[in-house]
Amino acid sequence: MKYSYLLLILLLSNLYKEGFSQGQPDSIVLSATIYDESPIVTDFEIETYYNGVVEGIVQPDLGADGTPVYCCGDSPVTENGRIVVHNQSTFYSWFHSVPGVNVPIPYDLTLTRVGDSTYAYQSNSFFPIDGNGFDNSTVYPNEPHYLGHNFHFCMKIHYSFTYHGGEYFTFSGDDDVWVFFDDVLRIDIGGIHTAASRTVNMDDLGLTVGQSYPWDFFYCERHTSQSTLNIITNLNFTCSAYDACGVCDGHNDTCCMVNQCSESPINPCLIQACGPDNNYQCEFVDKICNTTNDKCLVESCEIGFGCLAIPKNCNDNDPCTTDHCDPAIGCYYDKFDNCDACNAVDTCITNDLCFPRECNPRGNPPCLINPINCTSTDPCIFSYCENGVCIPTYICTPTPSVTPTVTPTVTPTVTPTVTPTVTPTVTPTPTTTPTPSPTTVPPRPTPTPLPADPPPYDLEEGCLVCRDLDCEKTGKSCTYLENETIRLFECKGVGCCKYTPTCY
């Protein structure tokens, strides 16, 4: 009887385990936030770096905002005389949204069931955001790229688990990895290094059966040339709340990417705006040009040209002053001694707003002409005055991104001369344009506008053409301006028009 009773218990136990296993999903999706970092930022793609695991970069307790706390304030973490992390300011951008420094991107990390209640993610080539964020050459044409992949990003995941006994978590990969269980650091394999492994057994943490505990995972890929991420665990992950972007315990900082606000408009005078003020919807607002500290220049954004800077008009219309401009302070005026202001209304009439006339208090000549200065700081922009307003004109000859004399149709599979995936996408030097003698100064570009018809041979189908503008109705001609945003990169599809038609 006792023997039969034991067999019954064993049978029921096996049936329970089988039923529990059959009730498990085939996969678990962990919603994550990835912060794509520019390799120009100091902590990423460090030129002279220490190759090895470095512990102690972060403090043992999770920060109040749910992210790791940097160990050392404004001081760097070094190993063998080489910098591992520069300071708390550079470290902050690893797991916080910082406009202009990183790009938050939502990502789903899918773990697949490999046992009764065991799930795994295994990748020796973990590149989840290739072509996104700073790796998008159309949106960020000046960002360097390495070996065909986006190697520079950090990822954070926040979930909870209920402790039943026997749970474990194993990680293997590179580079920095910190995992907190119940807000305490249990896996610490920081630094730039080859794949390293750690395992945490929940039975060793003094947890209470049936109670839920937070689990926080932080991972960074900071250097070429490998990216490995392997996870094996039987933790039963749960999420208490999702943010507006669908990220567990998120902060809504990836919503703009969800709404595709990373797409760059053809109009260079519009920029993306997305945030809580507009319910995380993508909007385009006017670009504010702020490229110079010269107070003698006035900046404005012109469609087809982008930001332009022309000399400030310091004319105070006072014939008893001499007008000046200092780049540091702007306009200033010297008053004439013993000057009697004259009346220019009757004697010095302005017939052309580009050449305003004013009376001469010294009497000879009776009128002075102060032409409006429309000189542009860009050698490819010729600005002229029309009705008192400076009008910019593009005078440089656009250079086709594929030189016709190479006859690209003969060998279409030839490797392009610009390879962003091998070397950083620094502006390449054209090889087909004649180079002036080193002892001479290259001449100023001469106006050579492209014809209105036919359109440029490499203009994508669906892009605007001169016929759409109908410039002739206004008595003007039409030409095509090269789109500087994508001039140096291969680009296909919507929003990748290499030229923009404009009236002149």
UniProtKB/Swiss-Prot annotation:
Tagged with keyword Phosphoprotein: no
Record region (Disordered): 417-453
Pfam families associated with the record: PA14 (PF07691)
Protein name stated in the entry: Protein psiD
The UniProt record lists the keyword Signal: yes
Superkingdom of source: Eukaryota
Residues of this chain annotated as glycosylated in UniProt: 87, 136, 236, 252, 290, 373, 483
Compartments where found: Secreted
Keywords: Glycoprotein, Secreted, Signal
Gene name for this UniProt entry: psiD
Protein family per UniProt: Belongs to the prespore-cell-inducing factor family.
PANTHER family in the record: PROTEIN PSIB-RELATED-RELATED, PROTEIN PSID
Every PA14 domain range: 111-251
GO cellular component terms attached to this protein's record: extracellular region
Native source organism of the sequence: Dictyostelium discoideum
InterPro entries reported in the protein's UniProt record: Fibro_Slime (IPR011874), PA14/GLEYA (IPR037524), PA14_dom (IPR011658), Prespore-cell_inducing_factor (IPR051154)
NCBIfam families documented for this protein: Fibro_Slime
Transmembrane spans: none
Bias kind Low complexity: ranges: 417-430
Segment forming the signal sequence: 1-21
Compositionally biased spans, kind Pro residues: 431-453
